[in-house]
């Protein structure tokens, strides 16, 4: 959520910045409503002051045995006017807040301006793309012999986009998740296994709604609806909603391992079948609470974790600075880490590291007190560390052998009883 005071102070500048994300944004309706709301508040305060003064005079008149009927009638009239005014104020303020919460975060100055992902800028590439003496297979084709995934049986129970891991695939997935959590711990992150269901206001606080309302799985729990998390970012941000930190306790780094649930798996082409786009997947998520001055260092820390992991897994990857049209609603800046998938002959995102400034904390009312006792909204950052489906695919496709076997990355072998190769089962 944006600061209305800044919008009032520099409306043209704010609108220019916001239009980098959405060229259709106009702040005029917000500014007009804001003026009306402030006028109504002033009128309300004036009427309340008049009523209070008259009430004092009525009390004195009665104490002195004087007639106060005219003043009593005036108080009744003011009360009726005040009731109507406050109803109008409540309605207009609700409309104003609804418009405000639909505005995205401002992009940083160094973010490329483009309406779509074609404007993303590759800022770093690491590792040579693998060469094969044979035609490399898509992971779905590799699976025909490896038998580590199943797409048909879960389609019977849950529909398309809900794959199941089996046999050696289960062990590889858990090895990967355990390895990822250990890396987070090495880098100083507090580990969490948080709830998978959250209240609606927690989704609001992280910026998922109202803009993306209807895109999340909902569970009815009596009179309350709970939502399956699309990412652990939601619940980690929500842990400290309406709380006040002391500056000396910041920064705070969290990492959570959870399944993630998304209704839109995306339109999958022929190459994007299998694990590339799914409704449920496992992910280790990083999250940080910082002061504005600590945010850049936290951003570099998260990026370093991701690069450390991809380097140890010996996967070719690149970092892309996302354009304004490809960034998330909440982010002011995002760098994607993308791994090379030979089966798709393309790079695919496995991590997004985002700065969110005070956008989420204003919605969640998360603040900190500085050494002088002054209150500030906290800054938040998040990043995947990492999402496993495409990482799983990258391991299979980049390390495949001619006979259909897959060489297990060395760093994962200790979690698999020092097993070196996934062997075909046929």
Swiss-Prot record:
It comes from the Bacteria. It catalyses: tRNA(Ser) + L-serine + ATP = L-seryl-tRNA(Ser) + AMP + diphosphate + H(+); tRNA(Sec) + L-serine + ATP = L-seryl-tRNA(Sec) + AMP + diphosphate + H(+). It holds the Pfam family Seryl_tRNA_N. One of its GO terms (biological process) is seryl-tRNA aminoacylation. Consists of two distinct domains, a catalytic core and a N-terminal extension that is involved in tRNA binding. This is Serine--tRNA ligase. The gene is serS. Pathway: Aminoacyl-tRNA biosynthesis; selenocysteinyl-tRNA(Sec) biosynthesis; L-seryl-tRNA(Sec) from L-serine and tRNA(Sec): step 1/1. L-serine binds at residues 231-233, 285, 384. Its EC number is 6.1.1.11. Homodimer. The tRNA molecule binds across the dimer. PANTHER family: SERINE--TRNA LIGASE, SERYL-TRNA SYNTHETASE. Keywords: Aminoacyl-tRNA synthetase, ATP-binding, Cytoplasm, Ligase, Nucleotide-binding, Protein biosynthesis. Catalyzes the attachment of serine to tRNA(Ser). Is also able to aminoacylate tRNA(Sec) with serine, to form the misacylated tRNA L-seryl-tRNA(Sec), which will be further converted into selenocysteinyl-tRNA(Sec). InterPro entries: aa-tRNA-synt_IIb, aa-tRNA-synth_II, aa-tRNA-synth_II/BPL/LPL, Ser-tRNA-ligase_type_1, Ser-tRNA-synth_1_N, SerRS_1_N_sf, SerRS_core, tRNA-bd_arm. Gene3D superfamilies: Bira Bifunctional Protein, Domain 2, Serine-tRNA synthetase, tRNA binding domain. Coiled coil: none annotated. GO terms for molecular function: ATP binding; serine-tRNA ligase activity. ATP binds at residues 262-264, 278, 349-352. It comes from Chlamydia caviae (strain ATCC VR-813 / DSM 19441 / 03DC25 / GPIC). GO terms for cellular component: cytoplasm. The keyword ATP-binding applies. The lineage of its organism: Bacteria, Pseudomonadati, Chlamydiota, Chlamydiia, Chlamydiales. It is found in: Cytoplasm. Belongs to the class-II aminoacyl-tRNA synthetase family. Type-1 seryl-tRNA synthetase subfamily.
């Amino acid at each position: 959520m944006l600061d209305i005071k800044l919008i009032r102070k520099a409306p043209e500048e704010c609108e220019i910045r916001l239009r980098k994300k959405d060229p259709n944004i106009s702040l005029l309706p917000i500014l007009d409503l804001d003026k009306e709301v402030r006028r109504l508040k002033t009128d309300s305060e004036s009427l309340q002051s008049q009523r209070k003064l008259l009430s004092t005079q009525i009390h004195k008149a009665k104490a002195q045995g004087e007639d106060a009927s005219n003043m009593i009638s005036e108080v009744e009239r003011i009360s009726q006017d005040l009731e109507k005014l406050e109803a109008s104020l409540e309605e207009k303020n609700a409309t104003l807040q609804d418009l405000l919460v639909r505005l995205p975060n401002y992009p940083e100055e160094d973010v490329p301006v483009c309406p779509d992902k074609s404007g993303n800028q590759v800022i770093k590439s690491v590792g040579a793309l693998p060469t094969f003496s044979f035609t490399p297979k898509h992971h779905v084709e590799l699976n025909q012999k490896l038998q580590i995934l199943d797409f048909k049986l879960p389609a019977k129970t849950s529909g398309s986009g809900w794959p199941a891991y089996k046999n050696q695939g289960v062990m590889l997935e858990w090895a990967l998740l355990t390895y990822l959590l250990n890396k987070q711990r090495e880098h100083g992150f507090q580990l969490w296994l948080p709830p998978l269901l959250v209240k609606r206001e927690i989704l609001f606080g992280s910026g998922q709604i109202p803009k993306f309302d209807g895109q999340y799985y909902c569970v009815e729990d009596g009179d309350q609806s709970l939502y399956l998390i699309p990412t652990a970012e939601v619940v980690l941000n929500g842990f400290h909603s309406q709380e006040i930190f002391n500056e000396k306790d910041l920064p705070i780094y969290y990492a959570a391992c959870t399944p993630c649930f998304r209704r839109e798996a995306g339109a999958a082409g022929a190459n994007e079948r299998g694990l590339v786009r799914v409704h449920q997947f496992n992910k280790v998520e990083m999250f940080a609470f910082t002061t504005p001055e600590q945010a850049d260092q936290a951003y570099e820390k998260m990026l370093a974790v991701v690069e450390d992991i991809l380097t140890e897994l010996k996967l070719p990857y690149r970092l892309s600075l996302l354009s304004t049209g490809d960034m998330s609603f909440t982010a002011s800046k995002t760098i994607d880490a993308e791994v090379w998938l030979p089966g798709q002959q393309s790079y695919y995102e496995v991590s997004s590291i985002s700065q969110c400034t005070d956008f989420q904390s204003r919605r969640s009312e998360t603040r900190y007190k500085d050494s002088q006792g002054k209150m500030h909204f906290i800054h938040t950052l998040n990043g995947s560390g990492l999402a496993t489906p495409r990482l799983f695919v990258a391991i299979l496709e980049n390390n495949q052998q001619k006979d259909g076997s897959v060489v297990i990355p060395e760093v994962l072998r200790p979690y698999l009883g020092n097993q070196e190769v996934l062997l075909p089962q046929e």
